[in-house]
Every structure is written in structure tokens, then in C-alpha cells.
From Swiss-Prot:
Record's keyword terms, sorted: Ubl conjugation pathway
Region (Disordered): 276-295
Protein name listed in UniProt: F-box protein COS111
SUPFAM superfamilies in the record: F-box domain
TM spans (from-to): none
Originating gene: COS111
Limits of the F-box domain: 143-194
């Protein structure tokens, strides 16, 4: 019974419900049997009526079968007949209710078969994913992803972070966020190290699409390679006396280190200034000649066999330590590739490795904490003499201005330029018919079109892009089989000499190339080139006039461009060395030319100051109005590739201000293409107005002096003519 009770508990249907089902089935069977059984005799009926009849027949099927026999199939004649009937019939009792009982053997065997034939977990997972992404579920709307946002919104989110580290972390979110983060990071570019400028130029040359993201370029905050803050105050003293200057023991890398990064001598990390010991030099010349052999390098950072052997023999020659060091050297040289890679990775990183920190403790006047925080590499020992400079080659700046086509703001203040050359590769071609001695002509090959060479390396466009010396491009010649007869012995075939043909030609870069690169920018709104020596007054004039002409042609307002040339030029207080809107700079240019570059005759003619004898009273111009009609005599030439154009000044009107403030306006007549300038001379409000008022006051003073001289020269004639008529 314990087993039966357990089985009853395990069933999904209660015992009472089963009993009701079975009793209902029994009643139906009794009715069917009662109809089929024959009629009993009288004796049998009497016995049954008394209630003392005992039925001895073993066939109890007519009275029904117990639930226990039905479920567990006891061997009896009635049970066997019922089982046979159930097997024969399609919906027998046992077949219908056996699946509800978990304790039966059939249930266990069926479960084992299902478990054996069931798919594995991976197959179930795949089937679940297939059902999940089936067509029936495709009509369901998925949740929106962060990558589904428009690019403008993502860029606005990244721009509002206001943290450079957080903006750089957005590069790792996804591909969409990486592209938007690049636009924000490259939008405003500022540099404090010339080494980073060289890296940036190389990056833009390899990936020109990044240059389109740059809108602002600031090179005014470049610093020298000195590590100590105290040395920055001595920069002027160092630049003045270069012969008595002793380079520091350690300095940060500059653009020269980036240029020669692949050079075996200048790019070697073994010769970095961080590995130098504090040995005292006698002079700069002796240190430069014998620096490779006199200074001790860092032993842990060295990977050269010869350097280690030479050092070990010098320091401990004849001792047992030499053998140990050589053994250690060869054991390190035959180390596995994985270990070598990790060792090189530690040494070649932009920051300092743990091995470098040992040399920081004896670096001259440096703090180990400050060096550890620095991400800049250290300069080569041969470049220590350039540590006090913060210059940039002219080719780097032209690269930046050429690749960053969407620049709106340029700041080149406080910038020193290093001379540079443009590399032109010459090609020779034959003109006319083919002969033994054809004529040869040279043609230039623009390397800017072919950025990469056959080895997938950047083709140097300027001399600062290459790590080769100057004489390589000066002396390299083509290998040619063309020979040319000597002019002195034309008939002697043995006197033929080979004509040398240069492969490269170096063209020096000037300020004109820089101005052309600046003027090629179509979206420039702010130009700051203040406190520089290399910007001449003619360069200022060219930038002002060309910018004005481009604005007039494109129908743009002159108030949208701001220029600053304050403190620039070789001379102090240059007239054009000012700052202000383009409209103010154009006005400053015109007034300066009229004051300094025009003769007295031109001024007299423009302002109509010449005396003309008449028989009427001469009406002199009022003191408050000065009108100059320059017409074709005052014009500005703008050189272009097709033909030069002229910007002419038609009228210059100077009056006293009615409001008391200094105002000016420049307009251009579309019909005669003349500039009309109107000036209201009053109290200046800005620095630009102060300089404009000074120039206009000088012009008015000159005009008034010329008018007085004209009146003094013709005083008698005017008095005679007017008195006679009176």
C-alpha cells in the first residue's frame, strides 16, 4: 500500500476523480450485460431475493473490476479478458490512463527514450534562436540601439563631454561612435611639442580624410625641449650666445627626432639622451666628435652585441665579469620571440618603462615623478644642441594647410620657421624622331599626386619629409646610356663623354609659398600671424588684397574675416602690423598707401587742391570735407594664373563724424568696379579704430599742409582777381 499511495500522490489526477470515472464506466457495462443475459429461473430468483445467495463464479467482470486490478494488471481470468478487450479496442482504459501514472515501467521507458533521442543543449539553443528570429516574430519592433542615433546627435553628445580623455574613450564604443569622435577630436587641434606636429603631419598624409575634420589649427603654443621650467627663462640667453651654450643632459624630442626615426644613427634608442651618464664634457666639438665612444649608455636598454661587448671590455677588462656578461648577452640574444617582443614593447613605448626609471634618478636636475608622467620620448644625443629651439620646417606648415581644406581658424603667432626645400623629381623625354643623339628636355614630376611609392612608403614631397641628407638629392643622377660628343672633338668617337643628368631638383620654399597655401583656404575666417619676424609687409599686403578680392568675387561680406598681424615684421610699428576685420585692414592699407607711397602731386590732383586762376571768388573746400578721386591711379594688382586683376580705388571721402564716433564703410560699385571708402572721423572705440584714426589724421594733416602751401604761393593772384571784381 505504501507503493500505491506514493503512486497515487504522483498522479496528475486525484483518486476521487478516477473513482468517479471508473464507476461511470461500470454502470454503462452493467446495462449492456443486463440486456444480453438470459432470464433466470424461479429458484434462482428466490435465492437472490432472500439475500443468502453466495455467488461462486470467479468471473467478476459483470460486476466491474477494481481500480487496483485495472491499474496494475493482476493475473486473473477477468483481468486477462479485460486486458485483451482493451488491447483490441482503440481507447482502452489502461492505454488512456497509463500516461498519467509516473511510477509505471512504461512511463520510465518512454522517458528514457525521449531523453536519449532529445537534442543537445547547443542544438536546443540554436532551435530557440531560430524560433525567436522566425518570420512570425519579425513583425515585432526591436528596441532602438544607441548606434541608431543620427550622426549630428552623436557628435553633439561627444562635444558636450568637455573632457579630452572621455572623448578619446568614445573611439572604442562602436564604429559609428568612432567616426563621430574623430570629427570632434580633430576639429580643434593644438600642439605644444614639435614632435607631435611631425606625427600629425604623417598621419594626415597617410589618411587624408582626417584632414577634412580639422577646422582650427593652433601652433602658437609650441615649447622647446627643455624639461626644467627654469630653463625656459634662459631661452633668450641661449639663443643669443650659441658658442658658449652647453646643451642639457636630457631633453624632450622634437621634429628632427621624428624625421630621422628610421635612421640607424639618429633614430637609435640606444643614443637617447636619457641613457647618458653625467660625464663632464670639455667642449662641444670634442663631445660631438667622440660622443659615441666617450659616454656610457644604459646597459639594460641596449640590444646591440658590439656595444655590450665593448662596454664590458672597457669597464672590466681582464676580469671574470666579462665572461659572465658575454654569456648573459648570448642567452638574451637566443631568447624566444615572445620574450623579445615584450622586451621591445617595453623599451619602444612612448612613455617610460621600468628600466628607464633607473636612469631618471641621476638625470640633471629632473624629477622622477615628472618624467614618469611625461608621454614624450627623449631626444637623440646629437640633437641636444637644438633643444632650445621651437621651430618648424616650412614644409610641415604647407602640408597642414594643404591637407586641412576646411580650416576656419589659423594661429601661427610666435612661430619660428626652419628653411625647407621642395623636392622635384626630373624626368627626361625625347622630342621628335628617334636618333642616336636625341635632344633631351626636362620636365617636372609632381610628387604630390603619388603619395606612396612602390614599397608603400610615403613619397617625400619636401626635404623635411625625408631622412636622407642634402647631398643625396643634390648629387643623385640617372643611369643613362646616352652619350654626347665632345664639342672640341666631334669626329673622334673615343672622346665621347657621358652627360650627367640630375634625378632630383631642390627648390627653396619662401613666404610666397606659405601665402599661397593660406589663400587657397576657402573657409578661412580667422588668421593670426602676430609676433613673427618672417612675415614681411608685402606679405601682409598680399594677404589683405587677395582676401578682399575673393570676398568680392564670391559676394561675401568683409566683416566675416578677422586678421591679426600685430607685432610682425622686421621693423617696429609697421603701418599694416595691426589687427581687425578685413574691412578695417583694407582701409588701413589704402590710407597707408595714400600717406606714405604717394607723391605731393598725386595728393594735389586727387583732392583737387591745385590753384586754377579765375575771375570769380575762389571757393576753397570746406574744412570738414575732404574728397579724393583717385580713379585709376590708386589700384592693387592681384596676380593670378590666367591674368592679373586690378582692384581700383575710386573715391575716398573723409568727413567729421556726426555721432562723435569713428566709423568707416567700404563699398564696391558693380558697374565701374571701383572701391568707395567713407570715413567719419571721430573718437575711436577699439584698438583698430585707434590705428585707423592715427593714419587718417596723418593723411588729413598732409592734405591741409599742401592746401596751405598752394594758398601761400598764389595769394597775390587770388587777391588781385577778387579785388578787381569787387
Amino acid at each position: 500500500m505504501g507503493k500505491t499511495n506514493k503512486n497515487r500522490i504522483k498522479t496528475g489526477i486525484s483518486y476521487r476523480s478516477l473513482h468517479l470515472l471508473i464507476s461511470a464506466n461500470e454502470t454503462v457495462k452493467e446495462k449492456r450485460e443486463a440486456e444480453q443475459l438470459p432470464a433466470l429461473d424461479n429458484d434462482t430468483q428466490c435465492l437472490m431475493s432472500t439475500g443468502k445467495v453466495h455467488i461462486l463464479n470467479a468471473d467478476y467482470s459483470r460486476y466491474g473490476v477494481s481500480v487496483y486490478d485495472k491499474l496494475y494488471g493482476y493475473s486473473s481470468s477477468a483481468a486477462s479478458t479485460i486486458e485483451e478487450e482493451d488491447k483490441g479496442s482503440g481507447d482502452g482504459f489502461k492505454k488512456r490512463y497509463m500516461s498519467l501514472m509516473q511510477g509505471s515501467s512504461q512511463w520510465k521507458s518512454r522517458k528514457l527514450k525521449q531523453k536519449k533521442n532529445a537534442p543537445k543543449a547547443s542544438a536546443k539553443a540554436k532551435a530557440f534562436l531560430v524560433r525567436l528570429h522566425s518570420e512570425k516574430r519579425r513583425h515585432e519592433v526591436d528596441f532602438a540601439d544607441i548606434n541608431c542615433l543620427p550622426e549630428e546627435i552623436i557628435c553633439r553628445i561627444i562635444a558636450n563631454l568637455n573632457d579630452a580623455d572621455s572623448q578619446r574613450n568614445c573611439l572604442l564604443v562602436s564604429q559609428e561612435w568612432s567616426e563621430c569622435a574623430k570629427r570632434i577630436i580633430y576639429k580643434d587641434v593644438k600642439f605644444t611639442s614639435t614632435y607631435r606636429v611631425g606625427q600629425f603631419v604623417t598621419t594626415l598624409r597617410e589618411n587624408p580624410q582626417y584632414g577634412k575634420y580639422v577646422e582650427s589649427l593652433d601652433l602658437s603654443q609650441l615649447k622647446n625641449g627643455f624639461i626644467n621650467d627654469e630653463s625656459s627663462t634662459l631661452e633668450n640667453d641661449v639663443s643669443q650666445s650659441s658658442y658658449g651654450f652647453e646643451p642639457p643632459d636630457i631633453a624632450y624630442a622634437g621634429w628632427r627626432d621624428w624625421r630621422y626615426r628610421k635612421n640607424s644613427l639618429y633614430g637609435s634608442e640606444m643614443l637617447s639622451s636619457i641613457h647618458r651618464s653625467r660625464t663632464r664634457r670639455s667642449s662641444d666639438a670634442s663631445s660631438m666628435n667622440s660622443s659615441v665612444f666617450s659616454h656610457n649608455y644604459n646597459r639594460t636598454r641596449s640590444s646591440s652585441v658590439t656595444s655590450l661587448v665593448s662596454r664590458s671590455t672597457q669597464t672590466a677588462a681582464g676580469s671574470k665579469n666579462v665572461v659572465k656578461r658575454i654569456r648573459k648577452l648570448f642567452s638574451n640574444s637566443f631568447r624566444g620571440k615572445g620574450q623579445q617582443k615584450t622586451h621591445l614593447h617595453q623599451n619602444n613605448g612612448s612613455g617610460l618603462s621600468t628600466l628607464e626609471l633607473k636612469d631618471e634618478q641621476f638625470a640633471a636636475g629632473t624629477d622622477s615623478c615628472s618624467l614618469r608622467r611625461s608621454h614624450l620620448p627623449f631626444t637623440n644625443k646629437f640633437f641636444l644642441k637644438y633643444a632650445h629651439l621651437r621651430d618648424l620646417p616650412l614644409g610641415y606648415i604647407i602640408h597642414l594647410l594643404t591637407l586641412c581644406v576646411n580650416l576656419k581658424s589659423i594661429n601661427l603667432s610666435n612661430l619660428s620657421l626652419s628653411p625647407d626645400f621642395e623636392i622635384e623629381e626630373l624626368e627626361y623625354k625625347r622630342n621628335g624622331y628617334v636618333s642616336f643623339f636625341p635632344e633631351e628636355t626636362e620636365e617636372e614630376n609632381l610628387n604630390g599626386l603619388n603619395t606612396f611609392n612602390g614599397d608603400r612608403e610615403l613619397t617625400p614631397k619636401f626635404f623635411s619629409d625625408s631622412d636622407k641628407p642634402y647631398h643625396y638629392y643634390k648629387d643623385t643622377q640617372y643611369e643613362s646610356i646616352i652619350w654626347k660628343l665632345d664639342s672640341s672633338r666631334d669626329n673622334n668617337m673615343f672622346t665621347n663623354r657621358r652627360r650627367s643628368r640630375k634625378k632630383f631638383q631642390l627648390k627653396i620654399l619662401t613666404n610666397d609659398d606659405l601665402c599661397e597655401a593660406i589663400l587657397s583656404l576657402k573657409h578661412m575666417k580667422h588668421l593670426n600671424v602676430g609676433n613673427v619676424v618672417w612675415l614681411m609687409q608685402r606679405d601682409m599686403k598680399r594677404l589683405i588684397v587677395h582676401s578682399m578680392e575673393s570676398c568680392i568675387i564670391e559676394d561675401r561680406c568683409l566683416d566675416k574675416i578677422y586678421m591679426n598681424f600685430e607685432g610682425s615684421g622686421l621693423q617696429t610699428n609697421l603701418p599694416l602690423a595691426g589687427q581687425g576685420l578685413l574691412k578695417a585692414m583694407v582701409l588701413l592699407q589704402v590710407i597707408t598707401d595714400m600717406t606714405n607711397n604717394c607723391s605731393d602731386d598725386q595728393i594735389l590732383e586727387w583732392f583737387e587742391l591745385r590753384w586754377i586762376p579765375t575771375f570769380r571768388r575762389v571757393s576753397q573746400p570746406a574744412d570738414l570735407v575732404y574728397l579724393a578721386r583717385a580713379c585709376d591711379q590708386l589700384h592693387y594688382v592681384i596676380q593670378s594664373e590666367e591674368s592679373p586683376t586690378y582692384t581700383r580705388v575710386g573715391e575716398v571721402l573723409i568727413t567729421e563724424s556726426h555721432t562723435g564716433h569713428y566709423k568707416y564703410e567700404i563699398s564696391r560699385n558693380v558697374n565701374n568696379v571701383y572701391l568707395t571708402i567713407q570715413i567719419e572721423n571721430g573718437k575711436p572705440d577699439t584698438i583698430t579704430d585707434v590705428k585707423l584714426k592715427e593714419c587718417s589724421d596723418r593723411l588729413l594733416e598732409r592734405v591741409s599742409n599742401l592746401r596751405k602751401n598752394q594758398l601761400l604761393q598764389h595769394t597775390g593772384e587770388n587777391f588781385f582777381s577778387t579785388a578787381g571784381l569787387a
